[in-house]
Amino acid sequence: MEFIDYDTFGVSDTISTSAGDGALPEPVAILNLNALSFEKPDEHNEINLSELLVDRGTTDGGKNVNLNAKMSNYAKLSMESLHISGTSDNLSVNTLPSYIPDGNKESLDISKLVFQQKNQSLEATNMILNKKLSKILNDYSFSNYQSTSYLRKSLNSLEENKVALSLDENKLTNPGYIGTLARKTLKSDVETELLKEHLTVLEEFRPIVRKIKKLSSSIENIQNLGTSMLKESKENATGTEEPMFDRIKSLRKDIDNLKLKKELLLSIRDQYTLTQVEDDKISNGSVDEELFEIINKVMRIKEKTVFMLGLENPNAGKSLMHEVNNILQRLNRKLFNHLLDILYIFESGTNNVNEKFLSPNEKGVQTFQRSLIYLSNDLEYFNEFLKRVTSLRSKTVLDQFLSQFDFNSKDANPIMLSAYDPLRYIGDILANVYSLIANEADFVRSLFNFQEMQMENTPVSIIQKKDEFLDGLDSKLLNEIIQSLSNTCRIRIGQIIKFEDNPITNFEIVKLLELYKMMFERKGIKSNSSLINNLSALGVVSQEKLIECYSNFVNEIEKTTYVATEDFLPPEWLSDYLVKITDLFEAYEQHGGRESDTNEIIITDTFLEKVIKEPIENTLLKQLKEGFPLAKKEEQARTSLYTVQINCFDLIKSRIQPFASVIFSKDGEKNDVLKWISDKSEEVINQMLELQKKILFDKTGLGMYNNLLNMIFPISSVKDDLDLDMYYSLSENSLMNLDSINTNVHEKLNDYVPIALTDMQGNLLFKLTSPVIADKICDSCFSTLSEFYITFRKTLMHIYPEEEIKIKEILNFSEEEFKTLVGIE
């Protein structure tokens, strides 16, 4: 923009023409208005401005004349700008008629005079500035919209920043010499800033100019050489191609070959070497995405280097491969140290720090996992890191587990063993182990689960390593870490099982062990791990201890002897033993019965044989036989033995039968035990039945004849009179003589049959604890006796039809009478 300056009106030209002095005029001192005499107004009209300078001590006449002319011109222009009446041509420079006050005192009031002059000066200044601004704005160079907008922005910027730029508006618009200096100062400052900006721009071109100057001599040489070559070629022109151009073509071809070689070498350098920045990143940088990109580049270099080994001269490939391996070794060592730092920070950090590190929003886990993926390329470092992880975490987990048994720690809540509740103690131990497994599983899976890792732009070899070494790594580490708890857990639980004699408690322990085995496996513990194997071994020990509880009880019973009582009740120990068994069966039923796989593991067919069958067969029956040593010789002792055995089996069946559908499966081997008990009971009942039949037949005298007839043809098979013909041969037997029959049968039959029912019920049936069995034996015996008596009577009448009356006298009870006497309807 143009600066508004009064000196533009010829002052500078006049000064420049002065002899040998180009300096700007200096401002004069302010006139002392009070020193003037205003009594004679006419005197002031004739003031010569040049005389003022004489009074100030100015002696140079030529200089005063020039200054006087300048001031006259200045005053003239100012008066024209203020529209003062009168023409400027007739106005004398030496007179100021309009501005000299009158001689009276009122007109000489300094304040009014200054105020009036100030208003007039401000008005004159505004008019001059308006003209200047109008001239600038109407300039053709600012007629377009862009220039106008730029000018408007510049003016607005000056207006807004006048305080920051220390612009004094009053000074800049002052028409006096102070305003002139202020505007010149502003102009100088603006020009200085413009010069600085121009210098800044030029400084940017300095390197370019310097390079161009360096090439200037070479360019001149090339130009000169080209000119000489063209001149030489014209002078030596012939009908064939010029030799000079042949050389040029040859040189150009060489240049193209060199360029191609250069491009090839640069491409090889870019593909097979690392930059200095990348090498510095390996040595001093942190592990981040940039380092992973460098690793990918090194791996790609290694993959490409393999092809160089197939060249005729593999030395370059071997050298490059050696260098790449060294770089990979440095990278793997860096990744190894980085992973160890994270591991140690996690071990020594607080829970809040660890949770923040494991947060999905944090990149620490992703960096850790990706570092481990790349580290898997070096199995030595990879396996060493896994060993460090396993050892550190195993120690931490074991310390946390043992702290639960520390009674001296103030912060610990120790697990205490109660003499009355060992099951709770074992449960607390297993619950503590489970919580440690759960926490460790969360930690391991958050760091070592690589299923969702993004592997873009990753070399194929790295991805193959991931699939080979990293899949299932979290489960592998978890099992190796938790392995440290297996022996400690086994020792503490084994101490409880070793001294536990309650079969129900042992059963509950087995159930508890199986439950936590299942829970551990669901958390990722493998079924073949040492912890699961130890729990299985403890379960086997507890099962053996369960069987041992019953075996010890039976072994103590074997040392005693059975003493028969008058009522032939089972031994007292049998009831106690059955109570122990039924308590176990009730616990079995409460825990789900056959629907529980754990129950099926505990209550097996082998267990039932050892706990039920073997004690009955080897202890109970043996003890009962020893209690009746004459049972083989005497029917009465044998009857007592059978009675006790029937009562024992009836007691066993009554206690076990309610659990038949729960424990003794119908299609399994467990049912064999229950079937054996039933068969054994039926066997004893049948033996008792046969014995009672024999006694009954002997007491009635029909025993010998019963055997005789059944030897020829079974009595039970006789259906009609034709079957009686089978017994005709008996007529030749002397025992079948009616007199012999009368002697052997008649008296006994008449004496015992009326009291047979009462005798059997009184001496036998009342001693059997089961009325059903007693009725069964009684009914079967008398039914057999009645059937034989009727058949025997018919047989005699069939053989000796002429002796019917005698036969009726010997066997004097009719069929109805006999049945009535023996209680058969």
Curated annotation (Swiss-Prot):
GO terms (BP aspect): cytoplasm to vacuole targeting by the Cvt pathway; intra-Golgi vesicle-mediated transport
Keyword annotations: Golgi apparatus, Membrane, Protein transport, Transport
Major localisation: Golgi
Membrane topology field: Peripheral membrane protein
GO cellular component: Golgi membrane; Golgi transport complex
Pfam families: COG6_C, COG6_N
Function text: Acts as a component of the peripheral membrane COG complex that is involved in intra-Golgi protein trafficking. COG is located at the cis-Golgi, and regulates tethering of retrograde intra-Golgi vesicles and possibly a number of other membrane trafficking events.
Protein name: Conserved oligomeric Golgi complex subunit 6
